[in-house]
A protein has these predicted regions:
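Alpha-helical segments flanking ligand/cofactor-binding loops in enzyme cores
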Residues: 60, 120, 139-140
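Short, well-ordered alpha-helical microsegments
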Residues: 76-80, 138-139, 174
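Short, charged, surface-exposed secondary-structure boundary motifs
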Residues: 99-106, 158-165, 175-180
Length: 181
């Protein structure tokens, strides 16, 4: 969504395309620097982006059924406007390093393999986890969970992981999660 709003097509590349998160983020930071975009410009653009149609309703329905944590490789500085529109779900994500002038100079990961590490930490204190995602960086947590699903993933990932149920619609994902509970 940010690539479209900013008019920078190179930023369409995500972890759905590049499994190496550090490589992807360093490349993205270079693109932002090249275009003179700092945190302020990015936050202004993100504030204009609405959740995907059906996302808020899905989360609301899911939160009525079970506890929900969003584990994301986004950054706290980017997530807030969207989380507000989604009714402030719990989100665990990373942090950007930002210079006084607003230039993004780097990023700090919460921990290595944050999605898988978080799922394992939750399991270590007695929680059962159910996970869904669309990208390479979601596969570890999906496979480590009691149940795991692909949601609106790429054809290549679905082909490479045929053992994972894949869904395109929120209602179908909700029913699969409900069944796994």
């Amino acid at each position: 969504a940010f690539a479209k709003e900013s008019g920078i097509p190179e930023l369409k590349r995500t972890t759905r395309d590049e499994p190496d998160y550090d490589k992807l983020m360093n490349w993205r930071l270079g693109i932002l620097k090249e275009h003179g975009l700092g945190l302020k410009e990015i936050q202004e653009t993100i504030a204009k982006i609405d959740p995907l149609p059906g996302a808020k309703e899905f989360l609301d329905k899911l939160r009525e059924t079970t506890q929900v944590i969003i584990i994301s490789d986004t950054f706290t500085q980017f997530a807030a406007p969207l989380m507000k529109k989604l009714g402030w779900p719990t989100i665990f994500c990373n942090t950007l390093e930002v210079a006084d002038d607003g230039t993004i100079t780097g990023f700090k990961m919460r921990c290595e393999q944050s999605k898988l590490s978080t799922v394992k930490a939750l399991q270590s204190v007695g929680f059962e986890t159910i996970a869904s995602g669309d990208s390479h960086n979601d596969l570890g947590m999906i496979q480590a969970s009691k149940a795991g699903f692909l949601f609106r993933s790429t054809e290549q990932i679905k082909k490479d992981y045929p053992q994972l149920e894949a869904f395109e619609e929120y209602d179908d994902l909700f029913e699969a999660i409900k069944k796994a509970l």
